[in-house]
Amino acid sequence: MATPLSPFSWLAIGIVKLYQWFISPLIGPRCRFTPTCSTYAIEALRAHGFIKGCWLSTKRLLKCHPLNEGGFDPVPPVQKQDRDK
């Protein structure tokens, strides 16, 4: 059974979804990665919890720039001790 998400994870996912619904359509596709950075952030928050999910999302956003080729960059698998409680 999956571990329930913390309220902070839900809040962060909600903020990313608001970005996907309202801001992303205005600026168009710019992400160099698959999955997109916003989808990656949601997957990381769901899989790893708030703290590690935010850390992974921040690292991913810092890699998403014109000098990086991009490509396929999935969320790393969950280690048992990594998941926030």
Curated annotation (Swiss-Prot):
Keywords carried by this UniProt record: Cell inner membrane, Cell membrane, Membrane
Cell compartment(s), UniProt: Cell inner membrane
One Pfam family it belongs to: YidD
Signal peptide: none
Keyword Membrane (UniProt): yes
Any one of the GO CC terms: plasma membrane
Main location group: membrane
Membrane topology: Peripheral membrane protein
Family: Belongs to the UPF0161 family.
NCBIfam families cross-referenced by the UniProt entry: membrane protein insertion efficiency factor YidD
Functional summary from the UniProt entry: Could be involved in insertion of integral membrane proteins into the membrane.
Name of the protein: Putative membrane protein insertion efficiency factor
Source species: Vibrio cholerae serotype O1 (strain ATCC 39315 / El Tor Inaba N16961)
